[in-house]
Curated annotation (Swiss-Prot):
It is found in: Cytoplasm. GO terms for molecular function: metalloendopeptidase activity; RNA endonuclease activity; zinc ion binding. The gene is ybeY. It is an enzyme of class 3 (hydrolase). Belongs to the endoribonuclease YbeY family. Binds 1 zinc ion. Its main location: cytoplasm. It comes from Borrelia duttonii (strain Ly). This is Endoribonuclease YbeY. GO terms for cellular component: cytoplasm. The keyword Disulfide bond does not apply. It comes from the Bacteria. Its cofactor is Zn(2+).
Length: 148
C-alpha cells in the first residue's frame, strides 16, 4: 500500500537547505496531483551516481539525475509514485554554470525531471522546445520554483 512518505538524504556531499527542499518537493507533488507516494531522494557526488549509472544503465560516467521506479513497465502516466531519485550536486554545479542558472534552480529542475520519469514520462532528446516531458518540466518549475 502506498502512502505519503518522503525521505531525503545525502551521500558524499553537504546540503544545508533540507526544510526548503522538502517543502519544494511537496509542492511539486501537489502541483502534479500526486497524492500517494513513497519517494526517496538522495543528493550525492559524481562518484556515487557514476557507480549507479554504470551498474544500472551500463554507462560508467556521472550524470545529473537517475530515477528508479518501483512500478516498472507502466506505459501510462500514473499519479502514484514509488521510487528513488538520485541527483549529483557535483554534476549540477557544472551544469548550472553551463546553463547560467542558479544551483538551486538546477536542483529543482532535476528533481522535477526525476519525478516526471517516476510517473511515466519519457523523452528522446533534450529539446526543451519540442519534448512534451521537458515542456511540462519547465512549466512545473515556473509554478513551484523557490529560492533557498
Amino acid at each position: 500500500m502506498i502512502k505519503e512518505e518522503l525521505n531525503l538524504w545525502a551521500e558524499g556531499v553537504e546540503f544545508r537547505h533540507w526544510d526548503a527542499y522538502y517543502n519544494f518537493i511537496l509542492s511539486v507533488l501537489n502541483f502534479l496531483c500526486i497524492k500517494e507516494y513513497e519517494l526517496s531522494v538522495i543528493l550525492c557526488n559524481n562518484e556515487y551516481i557514476q557507480k549507479l549509472n554504470g551498474e544500472f544503465r551500463q554507462k560508467p560516467e556521472p550524470t545529473d539525475v537517475l530515477s528508479f521506479n518501483y512500478f516498472e513497465g507502466s506505459e501510462q502516466i500514473n499519479h502514484k509514485i514509488q521510487g528513488d531519485i538520485i541527483i549529483s550536486l557535483e554534476y549540477l554545479e557544472f551544469s548550472s554554470l553551463e546553463f547560467n542558472v542558479e544551483m538551486y534552480e538546477e536542483l529543482q529542475r532535476n528533481t522535477i525531471h526525476g519525478i516526471l520519469h517516476l510517473i511515466g514520462y519519457t523523452h528522446d532528446t533534450n529539446d526543451f522546445q519540442n519534448e512534451t516531458m521537458l515542456i511540462i518540466q519547465e512549466r512545473v518549475l515556473r509554478e513551484t520554483r523557490r529560492v533557498f
